[in-house]
Amino acid sequence: MNKDNALQGSSTRPSQGHVGYVHSIETFGSVDGPGIRYIIFLQGCPMRCLFCHNPDTWKQNKVKSMTADELLDQAERYRTYWGEKGGITISGGEALLQIDFLIELFEKAHARQINTCLDTSAQPFTRIGLWFTKFERLMKVTDTVLLDIKHIRDEEHRKLTKFTNHNILDCARYLSEIQKPVWIRHVLIPGITDNDEYLHELAAFLNTLHNIERIDILPYHTLGTYKYDELHLDYPLKGVEPPTQERIDNANKIMESALK
């Protein structure tokens, strides 16, 4: 993974439209949307997922701020690698916390004929008021959504993330209603999301949607646990091991039914 050394931050830049608060940039991503992607990770996330491997993205600090044009100018340096399907992906943290910036960024990206992809857990989603109007506008310039569903059962979702999943599943339904291309992402965690009854329940929900292009089962891992030590935080899933390849294959097989 290449990190963009040109990432610049400024808290004193004169106002030039919205600015995004950026955690990091990956210049050559191959799994975060169609083709080769330039991935911008935004800072800030309300969820506290027990398995989170990027706790350093939680606080929405403003250390690294960049304008849409600055990010797009940097991204276009890598355009020759994108091919026909590649482009930019905005991830987090939770990117929708910065929805005004996202709208400006994606509208300017489309003006430059850059493919756009939003990677989100949809925690801020609501169909009420001004926020929904903004989301509708954002979807007009979003080519693909990577929707991360943490848990299909609300009670367990609250234990896992501290938030309900009602609005998240409603976001999935809305994206189906407008036929927005969606890739589903789901972390396979032994003892939490790795049992057949649960996986069939998830597949049954996904089967009610009509816009799913791909389902990615992401095996739980412990690669980010060192960050908890650096931040003087306790890691909630200490002792939980990654799933076996057999269980990963089993989950993928069950999810195949949701794509038929």
Per-range role (PLM):
Residues V63-D73:
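Short cysteine/histidine-rich metal-coordination sites, predominantly Zn2+-binding motifs
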Residues D56-Q60, R158-T164, H232-V240:
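Short glycine-enriched, charge-decorated loop/helix-capping segments at active-site entrances
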Residues M1-F41, M47-K62, R77-E84:
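N-terminal [4Fe-4S]-dependent radical SAM core
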